[in-house]
Amino acid sequence: GKSTFLNFLKALFQENVTFNTNEDFRSQFNADWAGKLMIVVEEVLLNRREDSERLKNLSTAHSYKMEAKGKDRYEVQFFAKFVLCSNNENFPVYIEPEETRYWVRKISRLGKDDTSFLQKLQDEIPAFLYHLQHRNLTTKEESRMWFSPSLIRTEVLEKIIRCNRSRIELDMTELLLDIMDTMPV
């Protein structure tokens, strides 16, 4: 599942990909990942508002302060994309209702377990790269995140946003729905 997909990305983009943990993302020391093309997290749980703000900032930043332990910070170009995977469908990351920087997808399991699936994917990398180089794009740039917000507004994203509401708001919604169901109209 998640590991196979992320290992495929690593095989595809090689040294331009780094695996991070939630703690790596929260650390002030970022020299090992700030210069990468892709930052992947296998079991993401970044459900604090400050995590969300940092992700939002980084997803549109053109430059970023890189910092290594015991060294001065310095500014670098920042162009990384984040791939965050999780089995937690309700609350893997805090997402505000009008947010347009996340494209959340639910990926179904394969029909059967195939222990050589990663190797099969890796064997197809040359053909896959050829396809990417020679295909026509089907979308035009429509926003700062390229895609139209309506294209990336998925049911799974909506579910996460609903689960991100405060406990009081969720309880009030449930109470009002119960009242509406029991009242004769």
Residue ranges of predicted features:
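Feature primarily recognizes SF3-like P-loop helicase cores of small DNA viruses
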Residues: 4-185
